[in-house]
């Protein structure tokens, strides 16, 4: 089996002129397309690479800077042997178009003044630059002259280019003759398994390193090949490390084959995220007809070490994602394996990383530490959802040689940072082939449909359906992840309205139960013998996937601060009785002179995810609550429980049914949902819903609870009715002590906030906070 990276579209190798110190956001296959939308700027950029007039000074242009994507950055120009910047004075969108075309993009989307991507270094080559937009190079635009400026680097200009590339674009490296300073962008590279022991393995871990040049795959001569080169190649394909291999078998194979060698060699330091960041090594020798040869050498071979999660030794290894006993770093909120918000463990508490100076090198250290390859993207701006708790690290700067992110240089001060700047990663992971073993059929778009899986039956591979009985959102999440389609937005137990493949109507999998961490549906628990009484044509499992999902988190501090006891007369609890917010013994309480003891508290539920939280049921299924005078869209939105220390429920009578709305929002975010006037219900991303301690049913009835030590627990979205990017933080726990008159709440925290060791100590913590008893 062969591993591919990108696609060779220009028929040759493209060379990218960049220095190793540049922070590159990602290296993925360029999605060249033949058609592009109309341009809103005039003159309209043309969709081909323009030739530079012979009488114009030759320059190189690149995009650089921090906190950027691959198609944006500070404009830097290579002139007279030195890189410099461009001042933002008189810069325009027309000049930005010229810059973007010069680095291979079809147009500019915008430009940024005042060193938005950080101040550069060296000379400021151009100032007061004026372009019409038709120029083929920035050197053709008028300016004050080379190096004539009154600007400072705080005025360095940046551009944001369209992500669409110019078809067949090739970087011109003729200006720079110092070959060791070149970086190389390979359009196509693969690990080709040679030995029979590796040909049918998933993932492919060993073989020739080959580059596609034109229509031919070519080997790389091993005369200048190093272990550092292997380290980078393995990282590209999702492996954290490389190992030695047996060269004798490959030497025998090479002697029997006619080989075609690539004309270049490469020189990596081992810290690069991709070989396109490596320097170009010495050219290989040529034979009389100018073909590249490898005198006294043979093709370069890599042998990579997969982490346990991707080990090919047996399917039992894939039951759950690999998790060490005490990890120091983890990923949260990502849709795919190997992506998420980066969180680190410090003093027993998990916290996030501020994205200041966050780059691909630091992200790669995280990825390798977790058992993946290098990073293909360093994510900034909490694009994978906001974390909670402390921000442990800021201004992280790794060299790429570190074994752990905590070994890197960083600033422990997080002044000026907030969770809107949480850093994340997308890591390279091995190609396992799981995506080819499941498909969606019959849906209205590629993101939905009946689930069909490929299984072995009587020695043959056949497609079939999955029984929809007990099919839920957790199982749907695994399918969407396996297909690379993000999160599940819906799980369907009936799919009669979707006409799947008629040759896949037989049920081949039933009783599926997933934990949510599996890499594929086949790794979930399921029946050995298929049992689906209702059949799979009408009751086949289905899913709808989405690129984003909400993430609800309860503010534990608010709960701890607002908890108190109230003895409330039964005469004021008639609505609560009707809504079953009191324990069963309340029916025997004197309605005129009796009272109930209520544990009251406020709940502030935040949506820290990437999309709005919407109730599963449509308006037609909402229930009118006469006492509250509004509709409740979710009958079971939360559980409020008081538990004994062994987990037994000791109290009943609490609020479960909810109306969902935006009480407050962060910054400039606008409220979208309200309960009044039969309004739309939900919680907007970046907003929160506040249930104050003084509203009906916002309590637990503890009238019958004896004094003692207890666990207070709140569970949001307990039945997983609405999909979220992270269900682990839906639980909030507190230790509580009740002496018959007062109650103390302490150590309130959401699930996953602390290490496993700290969580175990939680049961035995003796600290107390005093909460007073109020009597009405």
Curated annotation (Swiss-Prot):
Keyword Nucleus: yes
Catalytic reaction(s) noted: L-lysyl-[protein] + O2 + H2O = (S)-2-amino-6-oxohexanoyl-[protein] + H2O2 + NH4(+)
Activity-regulation annotation: Specifically inhibited by a mouse monoclonal antibody AB0023, inhibition occurs in a non-competitive manner.
Domain of life, source organism: Eukaryota
Protein localization: Secreted, Extracellular space, Extracellular matrix, Basement membrane; Nucleus; Chromosome; Endoplasmic reticulum
Disulphide bridges, residue numbers: 87-151, 100-161, 131-141, 221-294, 234-304, 268-278, 354-417, 367-427, 398-408, 467-532, 480-545, 514-524, 575-627, 581-697, 659-675, 665-687, 734-748
Modified residues (2',4',5'-topaquinone): 691
GO cellular component, as recorded: basement membrane; chromatin; collagen-containing extracellular matrix; endoplasmic reticulum; extracellular space; membrane; nucleoplasm; nucleus
GO molecular function: calcium ion binding; copper ion binding; oligosaccharide binding; protein-lysine 6-oxidase activity
Region spans: Lysyl-oxidase like: 550-753
Top EC category: oxidoreductase
Cofactor note: Contains 1 lysine tyrosylquinone.
Alphabetical list of SMART domains matching this protein: SR (SM00202)
Listed GO biological process terms: collagen fibril organization; endothelial cell migration; endothelial cell proliferation; epithelial to mesenchymal transition; heterochromatin organization; negative regulation of DNA-templated transcription; negative regulation of stem cell population maintenance; negative regulation of transcription by RNA polymerase II
Binding site for Ca(2+): 551-552, 724, 726, 729-730
Keyword Transmembrane helix: no
Cross-link named Lysine tyrosylquinone (Lys-Tyr), sites: 655-691
Pfam family, one: SRCR
Residues bearing glycans: 267, 291, 458, 646
Keyword field: Basement membrane, Calcium, Chromatin regulator, Chromosome, Copper, Disulfide bond, Endoplasmic reticulum, Extracellular matrix, Glycoprotein, LTQ, Metal-binding, Nucleus, Oxidoreductase, Repeat, Repressor, Secreted, Signal, TPQ, Transcription, Transcription regulation
Subunit annotation: Component of some chromatin repressor complex. Interacts with SNAI1. Interacts with TAF10. Interacts with HSPA5. Interacts with EFEMP2.
Role noted for this protein: Mediates the post-translational oxidative deamination of lysine residues on target proteins leading to the formation of deaminated lysine (allysine). Acts as a transcription corepressor and specifically mediates deamination of trimethylated 'Lys-4' of histone H3 (H3K4me3), a specific tag for epigenetic transcriptional activation. Shows no activity against histone H3 when it is trimethylated on 'Lys-9' (H3K9me3) or 'Lys-27' (H3K27me3) or when 'Lys-4' is monomethylated (H3K4me1) or dimethylated (H3K4me2).
Protein name per UniProt: Lysyl oxidase homolog 2
Organism encoding this protein: Mus musculus
């Amino acid at each position: 089996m062969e591993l591919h990276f990108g696609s060779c579209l220009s028929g040759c190798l493209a060379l990218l002129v960049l220095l190793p110190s540049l922070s590159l956001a990602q290296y993925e296959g360029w999605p060249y397309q033949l058609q592009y939308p109309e341009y809103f700027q005039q003159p309209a950029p043309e969709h081909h690479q323009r030739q530079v007039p012979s009488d114009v000074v030759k320059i190189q242009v690149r995009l650089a800077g921090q906190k950027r994507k691959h198609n944006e950055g500070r404009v830097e120009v290579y002139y007279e042997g030195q890189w410099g910047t461009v001042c933002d004075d008189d810069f325009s969108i027309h000049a930005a178009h010229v810059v973007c075309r010069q680095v291979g993009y079809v147009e500019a989307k915008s430009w940024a003044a005042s060193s938005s991507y950080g101040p550069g270094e060296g000379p400021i080559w151009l100032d007061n630059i004026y372009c019409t937009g038709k120029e083929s190079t920035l050197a053709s635009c008028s300016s004050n002259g080379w190096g004539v400026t009154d600007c400072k680097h705080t005025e360095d200009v940046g551009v944001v280019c369209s992500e669409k590339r110019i078809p067949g674009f090739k970087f011109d490296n003729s200006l720079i003759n110092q070959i060791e300073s070149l970086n190389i962008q390979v359009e196509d590279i693969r690990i080709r398994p040679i030995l029979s022991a590796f040909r049918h393995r998933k993932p492919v871990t060993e073989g020739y390193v080959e580059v596609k040049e034109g229509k031919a795959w070519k080997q790389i001569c091993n005369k200048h090949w190093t272990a550092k080169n292997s380290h980078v190649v393995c990282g590209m394909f999702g492996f954290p490390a490389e190992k030695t291999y047996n060269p004798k078998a490959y030497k025998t194979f090479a002697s029997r084959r006619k080989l075609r060698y690539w004309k270049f060699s490469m020189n990596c330091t081992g810290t690069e995220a991709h070989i396109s960041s490596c320097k170009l090594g010495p050219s290989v020798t040529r034979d009389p007809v100018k073909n590249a040869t490898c005198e006294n050498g043979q093709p370069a071979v890599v042998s990579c070490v997969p982490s346990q999660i991707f080990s090919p030794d047996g399917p039992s290894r894939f039951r759950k994602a690999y998790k060490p006993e005490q990890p120091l770093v983890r990923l949260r909120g990502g849709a795919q394996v190997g992506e998420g918000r980066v969180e680190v463990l410090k003093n027993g508490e998990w916290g996030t990383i501020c994205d200041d100076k966050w780059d691909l090198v630091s992200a790669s250290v995280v990825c390798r530490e977790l058992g993946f390859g290098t990073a293909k993207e360093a994510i900034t701006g909490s694009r994978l959802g906001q974390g909670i708790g402390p921000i442990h690290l800021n201004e992280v700067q790794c060299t790429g040689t570190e074994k752990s992110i905590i070994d890197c240089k960083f600033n422990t001060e997080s002044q000026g940072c907030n969770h809107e700047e949480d850093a994340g990663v997308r890591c390279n992971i091995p190609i396992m082939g799981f995506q080819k073993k499941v498909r969606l059929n019959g849906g209205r778009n590629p993101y939905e449909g009946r689930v069909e899986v490929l299984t072995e039956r009587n020695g043959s591979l056949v497609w079939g359906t999955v029984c929809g009985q007990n099919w839920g959102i957790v199982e749907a999440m695994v399918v969407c992840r396996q297909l690379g389609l993000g999160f599940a937005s819906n799980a369907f137990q009936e799919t009669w309205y979707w006409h799947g493949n008629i040759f896949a109507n037989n049920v081949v999998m039933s009783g599926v139960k997933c934990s949510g961490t599996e890499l594929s549906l086949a790794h979930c628990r399921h029946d050995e013998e298929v049992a689906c009484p209702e059949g799979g044509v009408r009751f086949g499992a289905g899913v709808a996937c989405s690129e984003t999902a909400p993430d609800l988190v309860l503010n534990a501090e608010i709960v701890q601060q607002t908890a108190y006891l109230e003895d409330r007369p039964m005469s004021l609890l008639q609505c609560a009785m009707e809504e079953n917010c009191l324990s069963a013994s309340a029916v025997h309480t004197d309605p005129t002179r009796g009272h109930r003891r209520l544990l009251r508290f406020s709940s502030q539920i935040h949506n820290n995810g990437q999309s709005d939280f919407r109730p599963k049921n449509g308006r037609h299924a909402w229930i009118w609550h006469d006492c509250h005078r509004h509709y409740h869209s979710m009958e079971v939105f939360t559980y409020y429980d008081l538990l004994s220390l062994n987990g037994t429920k000791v109290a009943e009578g609490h609020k479960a049914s909810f109306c969902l709305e935006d009480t407050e929002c962060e910054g400039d975010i606008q409220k979208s949902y309200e309960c009044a006037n039969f309004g739309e219900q939900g919680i907007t991303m970046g907003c929160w819903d506040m249930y104050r301690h003084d509203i009906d049913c916002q309590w637990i009835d503890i009238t019958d609870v004896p004094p003692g030590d207890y666990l207070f627990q709140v569970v949001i979205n307990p039945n997983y009715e609405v999909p979220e990017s992270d269900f682990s933080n839906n639980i909030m726990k507190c230790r509580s002590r009740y002496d018959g008159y007062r109650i103390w709440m302490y150590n309130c925290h959401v699930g996953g906030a602390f290490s496993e060791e700290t969580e175990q100590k939680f049961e035995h913590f003796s600290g107390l906070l005093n909460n007073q008893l109020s009597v009405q």
